[in-house]
């Protein structure tokens, strides 16, 4: 079915900042709608999110230029194209843009159209989006990586690491995993209350208390897991997003940026040793961006030390880009890739990155951004690609719940075909 009309508009995301929403209307009248997320901590090689820069509107964060590009440049170019030719449509937009970082049209403009086209095609065929993208072999429900303590650039808490996540690996179904996560989240709230700490939440719905560093945050999570009636390692493991690029400068990992005078300053070797110690002292089985995006030697060291027993996820390192992923594979850096659709800026390129990762034995983690909307597309992408893992925030804020609730619906629809789990990485636990 051919594209008849494309409409872009400016809406607000979960932080109250403008973002792009797109409607793609087919000749049949069927419509697909998508909105675009936005990150707070971003990799320097990410596709360019086009902002207006007009300080008199939204502090310069308006997206009217991107919307105008959709309505005046992209829409005429795609009108009449077959909505089911996803690769052809995405290529047409990339050719129209003509820049390596999508700086002419804006990655937010291109992505909004790309996702809305896929939704329109799925709606026209009257099939779920995950089935349209993934075909008949879609059955794996993702393990949720729930960010229950926020630090770094996602909160005002004096902790360098950006996310402390729980992973309900012992669940039998996604529904059970969601319940386990919610119970730990509420138990953590009580742990923090008893210490007189704030239970206000950060950008992704996790708590942002004034804890005394990384170990204090981890100990609070352990206490919450046990208070909820679960056993660390067996039922629930912990994942970290260090977001190390945020506090890396001139070869030094400078924790004082977020933690003040009490923070450490570590070399790459010391950073690796610190992460290794944490992985032995706590039930940690996934570490994201443990090293900075440009510290490739540090990444090699970390992968050599921990890669055979811990998932090492490249986010800023790979930015969902096959060029950087290919380099990581050839140089032995990381063993997993974080998938963020807005890092690369089109559905086709996102799927290409997932395919390359899976073909080379890397796990994939489908991810949200800290600035989100009610759009739940990433839930469908996680199932469509059998990703096995999803990062979409904590157990509060409706922008995060939209994804979890969509996954509940998908699991219900799949019925007994659904399998909960992910490609496991062997881990030697501390005796």
Curated annotation (Swiss-Prot):
Entry's CDD domains?
enolase (cd03313)
Q: Which residues form the active site?
A: 204, 340
Which cofactor is essential here?
Mg(2+)
The GO biological-process annotations, alphabetized, read as: glycolytic process
In terms of superkingdom, the source organism counts as: Bacteria
* Pathway the protein takes part in: Carbohydrate degradation; glycolysis; pyruvate from D-glyceraldehyde 3-phosphate: step 4/5
- Tell me yes or no: is Lyase among this UniProt entry's keywords: yes
Recorded catalytic activity of this chain's protein:
(2R)-2-phosphoglycerate = phosphoenolpyruvate + H2O
Keywords on record: Cytoplasm, Glycolysis, Lyase, Magnesium, Metal-binding, Secreted
Q: Which Pfam families match?
A: Enolase_C (PF00113), Enolase_N (PF03952)
In alphabetical order, the GO MF annotations are:
magnesium ion binding; phosphopyruvate hydratase activity
- Its biological purpose: Catalyzes the reversible conversion of 2-phosphoglycerate (2-PG) into phosphoenolpyruvate (PEP). It is essential for the degradation of carbohydrates via glycolysis.
Sequence similarity:
Belongs to the enolase family.
Name of the protein in its database record: Enolase
